[in-house]
Amino acid sequence: LKTELNPQQTQAVEKTEGHVLVLAGAGSGKTRVLTERIAYLVRDKKVSPDRILAFTFTNKAAGEMRGRVARAVSGMGAPSWIGTFHATGLRILRREAKHIGFKNNFAIYDEVDVTSLVKDIMKKKGWKLDEYPPSAVRTRISRWKTGLVPPGEAFDKAVDRLEELYATVYGEYDRQLKKCNAFDFDDLIVRVVE
């Protein structure tokens, strides 16, 4: 496969010190470069496959990469940590959730579950759902989460009364998820940081 690589791609494959950033357009060979890099590390540099972590953005790309790497290192053992950010986060949380106060058999709330929980919290607080759209509250909670802003800090940093109200929902939302031993989709990445 290395014969199909251009000089810059070959350099990215063979660089073993420091980080490598591969930027290129669709169909330009990024997956081929990453696959060959992993194979090079396993075959030529004798890196144990279980010491390699590779992220992709889609399940399809992860499956393709796993297949390509398995063929490239045939018989040497392919890395088991090739997946999407969310799938990898889920895998880590299933093993380590106890360290952040959750059980390993946690539930994952989908958008329907999340919207229902936000609506329930808002109703209990006496909010009129036509005045405060639950989707707007959910979007704000997601932004806080992905920005690694915990509920208390979100309230403290609120710029107006509406944001304070959203932050109170966020705090209750977070408590309810923990009480139900559940994560939402954002948590599959965010909670791994904890």
What is the predicted role of each segment?
Residues 1-7, 30, 34, 43:
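Conserved RecA-like helicase ATPase core segment
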Residues 2-17, 185-188:
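N-terminal pre-P-loop "Q-motif" helix
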Residues 3-11, 36, 164, 168:
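N-terminal amphipathic/basic helix or basic patch
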Residues 17-19, 39-193:
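A basic/glycine-biased coupling hinge at the interface between accessory DNA-binding modules
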Residues 17-37:
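Walker A/P-loop
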